[in-house]
């Protein structure tokens, strides 16, 4: 299945998708139920005569109980399989709405309208949906493609700086794993990205979506190459889970996880120090964290425990996405030096309050 992605900047002052676009969705589908992040203006959807479910946002809210509010509402309204769910918000909202659409009456249509950089460049594209479990992030979910994705870059005008920076972590990822030219463009244009220059943002979003679409087209269900989109995520998910969901934004944890994957790759001699420096430099330019704070509860045992239930584990073997060779190349593999991984974890937790080294 192919998903159409629309990227544009709507009229100034519009804080959500335009009334005409909302109404067009109403005309195309039988019913529309809009699920929005708490605090987002839903005025324009009144024109489409939609029903609305307001959900709390944040990784700590990405649970089965919260997601079921969508199912409950649809059942209360007596909506049939012609219903269309619309996700208006960030990545957490999109993941939950997509999952609800995947399981409601065994599958209904849904539309993504992402309002954060993170959702625009990553989570709204590709059909991954789901919720977190106390033992692991995104452990309950389904692959379910949206009918289309509307990206209104004007919604980013009110996005907090921290959320903007978090989303840029995923933009950086594309350059590292497969698009060296894009990485070099980011090095030159990071200041404009942080300044929310409209043309720069649109280009970054477009290039990111193109990269992800190419990978998903080749491997929709993550049997192989799609896993490379998870650079930094195995370490990052451990940080999110071990620190408590909501302490870190997803992109912040991924940024640290990417630096950890970089560190480990360098330890094994897979990349040179010149590339390591460029990665640290671009994270710094994006104002993203590259290490755990002193008061972090993370320790080596927590890292290994959470990583052991990562979705990329196969037959008991942890598999990681690591950098190898020149910029733009990576490897999804379980064939790595485990001591290098343990040494990397030890280095990153050494000064944390949790501390505790991995046994050699």
Language model: regions and residue ranges:
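ATP/NTP phosphate-donor binding region
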Residues: 1-84
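Glycine-rich beta-strand-to-loop/alpha-helix junction loops that act as flexible
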Residues: 57-58, 88-90, 231-232
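Residue-level signal for inorganic ion chemistry
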Residues: 63, 114, 152, 258, ...
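Short glycine/serine/threonine-rich phosphate/pyrophosphate-binding segments
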Residues: 92-99, 120, 237-238
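Alpha-helix C-terminal capping segments
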Residues: 96-107, 242-243, 263
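A glycine/threonine-rich phosphate-anchoring loop and its flanking beta-alpha core
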Residues: 99-192
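C-terminal charged capping/lid subdomain of soluble metabolic enzymes
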Residues: 169-171, 270-360
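Active-site segments that bind and position negatively charged phosphate/pyrophosphate groups
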Residues: 184, 188-301
């Amino acid at each position: 299945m192919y998903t159409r992605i629309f990227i544009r900047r709507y009229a100034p002052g519009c804080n959500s998708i335009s009334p005409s676009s909302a109404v067009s969705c109403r005309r195309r589908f039988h019913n529309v139920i809009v699920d929005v992040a708490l605090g987002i203006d839903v005025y324009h959807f009144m024109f489409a005569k939609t029903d609305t479910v307001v959900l709390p946002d944040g990784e700590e809210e990405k649970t089965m109980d919260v997601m079921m509010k969508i199912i409950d509402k649809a059942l209360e309204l007596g909506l049939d399989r012609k219903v269309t769910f619309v996700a208006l918000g960030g990545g957490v909202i999109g993941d939950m709405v997509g999952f609800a659409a995947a399981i409601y009456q065994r599958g209904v249509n849904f539309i993504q309208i992402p309002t954060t950089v993170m959702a625009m460049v990553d989570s709204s594209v590709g059909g991954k949906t789901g919720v977190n479990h106390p033992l692991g992030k995104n452990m309950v979910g389904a692959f379910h493609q949206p009918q289309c994705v509307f990206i209104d870059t004007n919604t980013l005008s009110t996005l907090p700086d921290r959320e903007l920076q978090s989303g840029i972590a995923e933009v950086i990822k594309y350059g590292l794993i497969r698009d060296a030219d894009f990485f070099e463009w980011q090095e030159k244009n990071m200041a404009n990205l942080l300044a929310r220059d409209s043309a720069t943002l649109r280009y970054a979003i477009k290039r990111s979506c193109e990269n992800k679409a190419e990978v998903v087209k080749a491997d929709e269900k993550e049997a192989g190459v799609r896993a490379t989109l998870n650079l930094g995520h195995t370490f990052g998910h451990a940080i999110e889970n071990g620190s408590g969901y909501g302490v870190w934004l997803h992109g912040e944890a991924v940024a640290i996880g990417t630096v950890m994957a970089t560190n480990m790759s360098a330890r094994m001699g897979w990349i040179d120090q010149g590339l390591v420096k460029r990665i640290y430099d671009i994270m710094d330019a994006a104002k993203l964290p590259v290490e755990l704070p002193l008061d972090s509860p993370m320790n080596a045992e927590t890292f290994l425990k959470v990583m052991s239930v990562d979705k990329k584990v196969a037959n008991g073997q942890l598999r990681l996405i690591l950098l190898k060779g020149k910029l733009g190349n990576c490897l999804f593999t379980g064939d790595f030096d485990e001591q290098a991984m343990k040494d990397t974890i030890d280095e990153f937790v050494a000064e944390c309050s949790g501390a505790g080294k991995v046994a050699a």
